[in-house]
Design a protein with these regions (language model features):
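Phosphate-binding site recognition
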Residues: 4-260
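Conserved small/polar residues in nucleotide/adenosyl-binding loops
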Residues: 1-5, 395-402
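A cross-kingdom feature that marks ATP-driven nucleic-acid transaction machinery
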Residues: 239-398
Length: 404
């Protein structure tokens, strides 16, 4: 039922005050279940600062015996956490549930473009991070390249200004946050490296990093199975920020002068395989964690591991380590986003890395490859030594068939 459907209601009722509108909704909720949704609540709260106190009063005194179901939505995470969920908020203690809407994974993202190639869908996921709003704004029709030219590498486009606008909306000192994000995008991952690039003290940068982590822009990672410590690194968690800071600032001159269409092939596109490396690792991890139904162990968690090989005295990294719910069997995996076929040397390498990792008594090896596998590695799979997977379709990664 709408308000105008009620007996004696005007066809298009108008309310001169918020109290009048809320009173009408309250009356309706006495008769039937009402789901009252306020979208982008932060905008309303800024325009009408007293609205939270008004809702507090009506929740406490008028809706306790009603059938009202109130939903407050907002894209400003900092506002929702402090002004709605925070202890200082008039609404504190009155929520019955809260949901943080997470980005889509690669499989869910591909549903938006069922007619595009697997590689294009993977790239769209890598650019947008699976955020539906960004997927729609990128507006890929026939070509990702054309969509980027029109809807990102153009000063008048929505996505061109999005990171700056988000930082201004969420943060009081966007310049410092921008410098930190830029430093991480350029390869600084440890706290000391980031502070050197930013030119601030460690304690100052650590405080700002915490805020960026809370906002989901940055993530703090430690080698799986290990406690936070000297090995802790910082990465960009938001793929759209990662893409934007990787390709927009360095090409700003070409974008401003309108030369980006000419420079795009060698200044942007040729670096996509390198950029997609981390994205592909996440896709493979998600496949094992959420979609694979024939794993040899029940996974507790999945992630990366890095450390020092004491014999060779060099740093190594394992793309995928899957830990067991129980027992001492682990999954060890490698992800290669390149067109070349992967051979037996990769299997030998991850066996060496597993020995350095050293946490398990038995290891199950997985290799993901965009470009497929050599005959020798396929034969190793037939002998049960390794499981090989290729993105025959990014919407359904499946075991590589030896007949292919």
């Amino acid at each position: 039922m709408c308000i105008r459907d009620r007996p004696n209601a005007e066809s298009s009722p108008e309310f001169t005050t918020y109290d009048a509108a809320l009173d009408e909704l309250t009356a309706l909720s006495k008769e039937q279940r009402i789901v009252f949704v306020i979208d982008e609540y932060p905008y309303l709260a800024k325009a009408k600062p007293a609205i939270s106190a008004m809702l507090q009063h009506i929740i406490d005194h008028k809706w306790t015996d009603s059938k009202m179901y109130l939903i407050l939505c907002g894209s400003s995470m900092s506002f929702m956490e402090s002004q709605v969920l925070g202890k200082e908020s008039p609404l504190y203690g009155r929520r019955t549930a809260q949901f943080k809407i997470m980005p889509l994974d690669y499989k869910e993202t591909a549903v938006f473009h069922p007619n595009l190639s697997e590689e294009d869908n993977a790239l769209i996921y890598g650019i947008t991070g699976g955020v539906p709003h960004y997927i729609n704004k990128l507006d890929v029709r026939d070509s990702v390249d054309e969509a980027l030219m029109e809807n990102l590498f153009d000063r008048s486009s929505y996505l061109y200004e999005e990171p700056a606008n988000l930082l201004k909306q969420e943060l009081r000192e966007p310049a410092i946050y921008n410098a930190i994000i830029k430093a991480i995008a350029e390869g600084a991952s440890r706290l000391n490296d980031i502070t050197t690039k930013v030119g601030e003290e460690n304690s100052v940068v650590a405080k700002y990093l915490k805020t960026l982590i809370d906002l989901g822009i940055v993530k703090k990672e430690t080698p799986i199975t290990e406690k936070p410590g000297k090995k802790t690194i910082y990465l960009l968690a938001d793929n759209f920020f990662r893409f934007w800071y990787r390709f927009v600032p360095v090409n700003a001159s070409a974008i401003d002068s309108g030369r980006i269409a000419k420079t795009y092939p060698h200044a942007v596109k040729q670096y996509f395989p390198d950029y997609m490396g981390l994205i592909f690792e996440k896709m493979c991890q998600d496949y094992l964690l959420y979609y694979a139904n024939d794993l040899p162990i029940e996974l507790s968690e999945i992630g990366q591991w890095w450390g020092t090989d004491p014999k060779k005295k060099k740093q190594i990294q394992i793309d995928i380590v899957g830990t067991p719910v129980e027992g001492n069997d682990y999954i060890i995996g490698s992800c290669k986003y390149r067109n070349e076929k992967i051979g037996l040397d990769e299997l030998e390498l991850i066996r060496e890395y597993a020995a350095v990792f050293g946490k398990g008594t038995n290891y199950h090896y997985y290799i993901f490859s965009k470009g497929g596998f050599t005959d020798g590695l396929l034969q190793a799979q037939e002998r049960g030594e390794v499981q090989l997977l290729t993105p025959v379709s990014y919407t359904h990664l499946r075991a590589h068939e030896t007949s292919l």
